[in-house]
């Protein structure tokens, strides 16, 4: 069993974006390829949780396993994706990553995993005053909590965090760059993110 593994969530419908965000162009590749390049530089084992509509396209782009949600919980949001990844790879801790935060840095995963310790169930960054539960780390013991929530048809990350002993980490305290956490939900945000990138 690995100590650390990574789970990339690419199962959302991207309805506000208008096309699958995982496949959006970014720095000569795609969001998903860029994010995986960053993650696999820090983590040996990474799995992508994909929407069935784009699974084959994602598989052609990446060199890591691409799976769908556990059938019983298919389409139940990020909790279903996280627990599906936990079932696929055995690890003590899982670094979670959405497919729509293309600015993420490998430094973030180093910082995040350094913050883990057995007394906590989760390590969640707070960036500009906002919790970022999808750019966080979760201990494998939360798997049972996720199953219990899904059984009760509860799907929110906030409901999971309320049941966990969470170590909240202020981005400023660990020298995390707020730009790493920018997520792209609309075409306007995508255009802005590309502009910001070209201005660097």
Swiss-Prot record:
PANTHER family, sorted: MOLYBDENUM COFACTOR GUANYLYLTRANSFERASE
Reaction catalyzed: Mo-molybdopterin + GTP + H(+) = Mo-molybdopterin guanine dinucleotide + diphosphate
Function: Transfers a GMP moiety from GTP to Mo-molybdopterin (Mo-MPT) cofactor (Moco or molybdenum cofactor) to form Mo-molybdopterin guanine dinucleotide (Mo-MGD) cofactor.
Family: Belongs to the MobA family.
InterPro entries for this protein: MobA-like_NTP_Trfase (IPR025877), Molybde_CF_guanTrfase (IPR013482), Nucleotide-diphossugar_trans (IPR029044)
GO CC annotation: cytoplasm
Classification of source organism: Bacteria, Bacillati, Bacillota, Bacilli, Bacillales
Chain sites annotated for binding Mg(2+): 100
Subcellular location: Cytoplasm
Alphabetical list of Pfam families matching this protein: NTP_transf_3
Domain of life (superkingdom): Bacteria
Stated name of the protein: Probable molybdenum cofactor guanylyltransferase
Keyword Transferase applies: yes
Residues binding GTP, per UniProt: 9-11, 21, 69, 100
Main location: cytoplasm
EC number in record: 2.7.7.77
Swiss-Prot/TrEMBL domain comment: The N-terminal domain determines nucleotide recognition and specific binding, while the C-terminal domain determines the specific binding to the target protein.
Residues making up the signal peptide according to the UniProt record: none
Required cofactor(s): Mg(2+)
GO MF annotations in UniProt: GTP binding; metal ion binding; molybdenum cofactor guanylyltransferase activity
Keywords of this entry: Cytoplasm, GTP-binding, Magnesium, Metal-binding, Molybdenum cofactor biosynthesis, Nucleotide-binding, Transferase
